């Protein structure tokens, strides 16, 4: 049973937990930094004094976000167009960041992702390949590019990847994402043991239900306006999390205060994974018939401009 009074017992506190200037002198790169959780992380970093680079494919949105962050925080935030699936573009972007800030990032947050809910038998090879290319291969591209530069320059860095509890538990209807995020978590643990000798550390944050327009817009069709409320009912604390709560945790992990934290996967989900096995909506989605799946497929097809998801 979910808590009936989350405002009293589990209040939301979105203000930064670290002191002002805690990340001063750091250069932070946040992939997928234009919206949602990535935007919240970038905003918190800027508030704490870091010089922030946000990267994604849509430059117009990035420019809007960077301007908003600088206006809100008085900090530094620069947008960079980068497709993490393209290793050459990733390398070029790191060159631009180095030129802009005088060094490569001290902090990397792998937040860029792709996902949608769909019955697995309806997925084309292109559909699951696209998710794997973004979430797993893209994250590897960015992480290894930073790692090589740190090793060459003999400088350290903190890398935090945003994953999900279903990377460990598995979950129906989001198989490509589960496979990819599982790979990211193994990458995190593996590089923590291999590259610590070079001054790099690697951790991951696994958020529970965090309603954002970008991520939830990819997952659910426009008709599912009750999803957020249903998520609250499925959480022991009786509420969803906020992007700012994730941002606070990521900032703390990325700071020098947590230099001994390495190779750790942290769940920030209000106890969600223990409440219903890490799959927030599995039982609900199993009730969908073929007509409903067809409607969802049409929504995804219209959003991507492709014939099949």
Curated annotation (Swiss-Prot):
Organism: Caenorhabditis elegans
Protein's name in the database: Probable 2,4-dienoyl-CoA reductase 3 [(3E)-enoyl-CoA-producing]
The protein's role, per its UniProt record: Auxiliary enzyme of beta-oxidation. It participates in the metabolism of unsaturated fatty enoyl-CoA esters having double bonds in both even- and odd-numbered positions. Catalyzes the NADP-dependent reduction of 2,4-dienoyl-CoA to yield trans-3-enoyl-CoA.
One GO term of the biological process aspect: fatty acid beta-oxidation
GO molecular function, one term: 2,4-dienoyl-CoA reductase (NADPH) activity
Binding locations of NADP(+): 32-37, 57, 83, 181, 207-210
Catalyzed reactions per annotation: a (2E,4E)-dienoyl-CoA + NADPH + H(+) = a 4,5-saturated-(3E)-enoyl-CoA + NADP(+); a (2E,4Z)-dienoyl-CoA + NADPH + H(+) = a 4,5-saturated-(3E)-enoyl-CoA + NADP(+)
EC number: 1.3.1.124
Keywords of the record: NADP, Oxidoreductase
Binding positions for substrate per the UniProt entry: 57, 116, 124, 218
One of the record's GO cellular component terms: mitochondrion
Family of the protein in this entry: Belongs to the short-chain dehydrogenases/reductases (SDR) family. 2,4-dienoyl-CoA reductase subfamily.
Matches recorded under Pfam families: adh_short_C2 (PF13561)
List of catalytic residues: 166
